[in-house]
């Protein structure tokens, strides 16, 4: 030990100083030793382990975070939203009517609560209603609301009015055609020669006459027939039944002139009445036979 300490205590010579500054040899040796140590102490990977044991690679499962559900326009307009509410309301929701207002209101609130709980279970009923009220002010919800209201409006009257208008239009056309048919028939009757009178043309059949062929129109419907009957009745009403006023006045005057001479002739005394009339003064002077002759004619006595 003393010898070693004495060797260490010896002063450094020039050779030792040169060895200190000789870095090339020492650095290469140091770098080689560090690389070998790292290779020896390196941990074995999973691939090397699996190849040695015949096992598959380890499957790493990464759990994705589920998105938080929100009550927005898409959820409210989905099949579980307002469309479901409309369908179930038509099928399940029924009211008793007058005298059961409180029970009907409770049934309605319970119905809405169940629907909102299925749609968005994270929120309470009052909070969900507040959120739906805010969403109701958006343009998309308002347009859908108008469409739903229009769908619920009754359209039976409009659907019934369209066939009525079509029927009225067809009826007007048929009546106009029916009104034009008599004029066409008259023009055809004037143009075609007939040996018979016009009065007999309505009742004579023209099947045997090949020169005179008339297109017979089809039988009109009930509405057209009624219209034609009304037109004929109007024509009959317009025609006067009796003579005109001038002819009537003339007839009345003639009857009055005939009645006046009859009255005159009836007021004139007849010969028999003259004979029966005997003055009262001569009754006392005349004889009974004379009175008998005056009262009873001679021919009656015979």
Curated annotation (Swiss-Prot):
Annotated InterPro entries: Csm3, TIPIN/Csm3/Swi3
Principal subcellular localization: nucleus
Comp. bias intervals (Polar residues): 34-48, 175-194
Pfam families per record: Swi3 (PF07962)
Entry's Gene Ontology molecular function annotations: DNA binding
GO BP: any one term: DNA replication checkpoint signaling
Localisation: Nucleus
Residue spans of biased composition, Basic and acidic residues class: 146-158, 231-242
Region Disordered, annotated ranges: 1-20, 34-53, 146-215, 231-274
UniProt keyword annotations, A-Z: Cell cycle, DNA damage, DNA repair, DNA replication inhibitor, Meiosis, Nucleus
Record's GO cellular component terms: replication fork protection complex
Subunit structure: Component of the fork protection complex (FPC) consisting of tof1 and csm3.
Family statement drawn from the similarity comment of this UniProt entry: Belongs to the CSM3 family.
Function statement: Forms a fork protection complex (FPC) with tof1 and which is required for chromosome segregation during meiosis and DNA damage repair. FPC coordinates leading and lagging strand synthesis and moves with the replication fork. FPC stabilizes replication forks in a configuration that is recognized by replication checkpoint sensors.
Protein name per UniProt: Chromosome segregation in meiosis protein 3
Organism (species): Aspergillus terreus (strain NIH 2624 / FGSC A1156)
